[in-house]
From Swiss-Prot:
Gene3D superfamilies: Nucleic acid-binding proteins. GO terms for molecular function: single-stranded DNA binding; zinc ion binding. It is found in: Nucleus. One of its GO terms (cellular component) is nucleus. NCBIfam families: rpa1. The gene is RPA1. InterPro entries: Euk_RPA1_DBD_C, NA-bd_OB-fold, NA-bd_OB_tRNA, Rep_factor-A_C, REPA_OB_2, Rfa1. GO terms for biological process: DNA recombination; DNA repair; DNA replication. As part of the heterotrimeric replication protein A complex (RPA/RP-A), binds and stabilizes single-stranded DNA intermediates, that form during DNA replication or upon DNA stress. It prevents their reannealing and in parallel, recruits and activates different proteins and complexes involved in DNA metabolism. Thereby, it plays an essential role both in DNA replication and the cellular response to DNA damage. This is Replication factor A 51 kDa subunit. Keywords: DNA replication, DNA-binding, Metal-binding, Nucleus, Zinc, Zinc-finger. Belongs to the replication factor A protein 1 family. Pfam families: Rep_fac-A_C (PF08646), REPA_OB_2 (PF16900), tRNA_anti-codon (PF01336). Residues 23-105 bind DNA.
Amino acid sequence: MHQPGSHQIQPIDSLTPFLGGKWWIRARVADKSDIRTWNKPTSQGKLFSFTLIDESAAIRATVFNDAVDTFEPLVVNGQVYYFSGGQVKNANRRFSNVNNDYELTFDRASEVILARQDSSAAALPMQRYNFVPIELLKQREVGSLVDVLGVVLKVDEISSITQKSTGRELIKRNVKIGDMSAAVEVTFWNDEAKAWNYPVGTVVALRQLKVGSFDGVTLSSTYQTKIDVNPADLPDVKKLATWYVSTGGANVVSLSSQGLGAGGGGGGEGNRGRKYLDEIQSEGIGRGAKPEYVDVRCVPIYFKQDAQWYDACPTCNKKVTEEGAQGDRFRCEKCDATVVPTQRYLVSIQVTDNVSQVWLTLFNEAGVEFFGMEASELKRRAQEDPLYIAKLAQARMNRPVVMRLRVKEETNANAMTGEESDRLRMSVVRISEFMPVAGTTEETRRRLAQNLRSECDDILRCIEAYV
C-alpha cells in the first residue's frame, strides 16, 4: 500500500467532525491499551485505544469490534503511522484527558500504514502530557482523568481488599506523590501495585489517573494509566529533583486529607484552614454530616506509654486475637485465618497550643511521622530497651509541630444504659514538621489575654448573680 503524499496529510489539530473528503494524518502511537471486551444484554464487542501525536496536537483513538483484529497487531507504541478513514467526534472526558475537543474511532473501512521511520518521523514528539499541578487537583471533578508530574515521597506496602460488588480480592499499593505545590495519595491496583519498584525521591510522570474523593483528594490508577520514570525530555523534571534534594519534600500539604468542593470544583469545602484548638469547639467544626479538616500549631505534652500499637492482620489491618499459649499464633476473624501479625499505631496523645488542651488519636501513618519509624520497629526497640519509649517521649514532647486534624462528631451508645451521647473525635492525619522551639508570639499573647479577659468576665457575672 502506497504512503500518501505530504500534500494529503492533515495536522491533528485541524481534524473536526465537519472535515469533508478523505483525510490522512501522520502520527506517533502512545498509550496503547490492552484489548477490552464487554458482554451486555443489549450488545457485546471488543475495543482497544491509543493516543496519536504529531507536531500540532494529540488525539485519542479507539478501535472497535472487527477492526480490532486488523489494527491491534499492526499498531505498536512509539511507531509512526499514517491513518485514514476514522470518524471524528466530540471527546468523552470520562475516558480520556487528552487535550483535544475531539476523538477518533476506527472501523473496518479505516486504513493504517506504517510510515518510513526517517528523520521527519523521529522529530514527532514521543508523548504529550497535560500536567495538572497537584494543588489544583481539588478543582477537578471526581471521576475525571489527569496527568501528574511529581516526586515519590512515600511508598506503602502492598495490601488487599475485597470488592463488594464481585467478591474479588484486589491488590493495592498507596504511593504519596508530591510537587512544590502539594502532595497527594495515588492508589495503584493489582499488577501495577505488585510491579511498583520506584523508590522515594524518584521523579515520575503519571498519565490518566482518576480523581477520587475518599477522605480528601486522591488519585487512582486506571487501565489507561502509564508511568514514565525520570523523563529527561520534560523541563520540570530537573527542577523537581533539585527541590526534593534541597527540601526532602517536607512542608507540602497533602490533599488526601482535604475534601473536594461540590462537584469537585469548590476546592475548599471541608478544609477550614489554620485554627486554634478552642476554635474547633466554638465554631462547631466537625458537627456536620461530613468530617472537616483543620491545621493547628501545637505542642505534644503527653502520650500514653503503655499502648502505642496493636497487632494487626497484614491483609486487612484489623486487630487480631492471640491463640497460642506461647504468644506465637494469632487469628484474624475478618479473614478467618491464622496470621503472622504486623504492628500498626493507635496512640492517644495530648497537645496544647498555650490556650487549650485536647486529646488526639494518631493512626498508623501519622504515628510513623510522629515516632519516625514503623510500629514494628518501635516494638522491637522497646523490647530490647525497656526505657526506650520513655526516652523517645522525652525527645518528642514539648516541641512545636503543625498537625492536620480530622474532626467529626460521632454518636455513641452507653453499653450499660443504652443512652446515646455525642462526642467530637479528632485524629491526626498529618504532622507536617517539627519546628525549633520559639518564644511566645504576639498572636499567642493576644489569644491568652483574650481568654483571660473572658474568664474574668465569667467570674464577675457569677459574683453579680450572688450579690
